[in-house]
Each structure stands twice: as C-alpha cells, then as structure tokens.
Regions:
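Non-heme di-metal
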Residues: 1-270
Length: 270
C-alpha cells in the first residue's frame, strides 16, 4: 500500500507543536488589526479539513489505502488550525466553540478522480499562498508558522500525486478527467481564486464573516497574474508525467485533452 511508505515519510518530516513553535517569542504588538482579522479567517478555513475528511471517507469508501492516508492528512491539517488558533490566543483572540458548527458543510458527492485532482492542485496553490504570507507577515513567529504550513501543503500535494499515478496505472481511461480538472484549476485569478475551500456552492469561505478575505490578501501580497506560474509549473509537471507528453502551458494541456478524448471514446465503444 502507498500508505505504508507515506506514513514513514510524513512521520519523519512532521513538526511538533509543543517544541517547534516559539509561542513565548510572539510579539502581538507587531500585528495590525487587519492581520489579526485575516489570520482568524485562515484559522477557521483550516477547520474545513474536518468536512473534507468526511467527504473523502464517503467517496473513497472502498479504497482502504487512500482512506488510511487521509487519516494522516486530517491529523496534520487540523494541526494547522490548532497552531493558528494557539497563535491567535497568544495575541488576545478568543474562539467560542459554539460558533464553529455554523461553519459546517456537507460536500455533495462527485467523481472521486476529479476530487483527488482538485485537492492535488489545491495543495499546490495553498503552499504558494502560504509562502507569500510567510514573506509578508510582520511578526517573526508567524512568518515561521506560514513557512512550516507551506512545506506541509507541498508534502500533501506529493502524496495526492502518488494516488493519481496509481489511478492512471490502474485505469488509464481516467486520464482525460484528471487533465480536464487540472486545466480548470489552473485557470485561477486573484479575484476568483480556485481552491477546495472556495469553489463549491456554497463554499467554506462563504460561511465566514468576510468571504472575500482570500482575494484581498492575494491582491495585497501576490499582485498581478504572473505569480501563479510556479503553481502551473508544478501541476503541469505531473500532468506531463501522467500523459507521457511534455506539457509546458495550459494550451498544451488543452491540446492534450482534445487529443485524448477521441481515443477514450473509441476505447469505451469497444
């Protein structure tokens, strides 16, 4: 099982909340009210890992390997919520447990392979965002936290990539669906950012007091459109590997989708 190897790799790389985060060194005076506001929203958004895990266990019910991995993913993602909450508490913020159920969502069932692809792309993008936030955060401990979370998200993306490789190896006809979802996810803008927490109807972010906070932060800390190129490169690298074709741009990806569709139709008819 892929899970066996991932368990060891992730355990080896895992950071410790009690020893690796310098909570005693936090200087709340360096944070503006806006940073506190946005950080609180990021913290609450991370709580959505609970709802995503429920979705994964439901939609991948027969896939023991993947569901086993999701148990690790859930633990690490909920630690993201916890470290941000503990940070905010050190800055004088409080969280009322009664407010949390209002954020709960049940995601509608969807094609499992598309969900898997969406989350691979989403982890790549969130790592990119957190890396930018780590460079702009005004408080040193917070900069370190964002850097740590970004590294986690990249590791999670690599784990999803392993399951996408397995899917194509076991069922090659699923490749066009993977490519189409990747193309859709690549086409993201600051004003309409694509991440699993923003694209459902309603979305996780829709449940928040300030549902536009991600767009605002991106326009402040990642202005323009060129900043997405590293995300595109990483997504296209995996799609190139799965397709066995060099894909250097979204247009290349679109052309590959068009080329594969007739083959899939013929295979299905046969």
């Amino acid at each position: 099982m892929i899970y066996d190897d991932l368990f060891i790799r992730l355990e080896r790389a895992r950071w410790q909340l009690s020893t690796d985060i310098a909570f005693d060194a936090i200087d709340p005076s360096l944070l503006s009210k806006q940073w506190i506001h946005d950080l609180r929203h990021i913290c609450l958004t991370e709580l959505s890992a609970l709802y995503a895990t429920e979705m994964f266990i439901r939609d991948f019910y027969a896939d023991i390997d993947f569901c086993s991995f999701i148990s690790i993913w859930f633990y690490e993602e909920m630690k993201h919520h916890l470290v941000l909450r503990k940070y905010l508490e050190r800055c004088g913020e409080t969280f009322d447990e009664a407010e949390l159920p209002s954020l709960r969502l049940t995601f509608a069932p969807g094609p499992a392979i598309e969900t898997l692809t969406m989350h691979f792309c989403g982890e790549q993008r969130l790592a990119h965002w957190y890396t930018a936030f780590s460079k702009h955060a005004p408080e040193p401990v917070l900069r370190g936290i964002f850097k740590t979370l970004a590294a986690d998200e990249l590791r999670h993306a690599a784990c999803y990539a392993k399951y996408l490789r397995r899917a194509v190896a076991n069922k090659p006809e699923c490749l066009p669906d993977i490519l189409k979802m990747s193309l859709w996810m690549i086409r993201s803008t600051n004003d309409a950012p694509k991440h699993p927490t923003t694209i459902t109807e309603p979305s996780v972010c829709d449940q928040l007091e300030d549902p536009e906070y991600i767009s605002r932060m991106l326009n402040w800390y990642l202005p323009g459109r060129d900043h997405e190129k590293p995300v595109q490169r990483r997504i296209l690298a995996l799609m190139s590997e799965l397709s066995e074709v060099n894909l250097e741009s979204p247009r290349d990806l679109l052309n590959q989708i068009r080329e594969l569709q007739p083959r899939v139709a013929v295979t299905s008819a046969a």
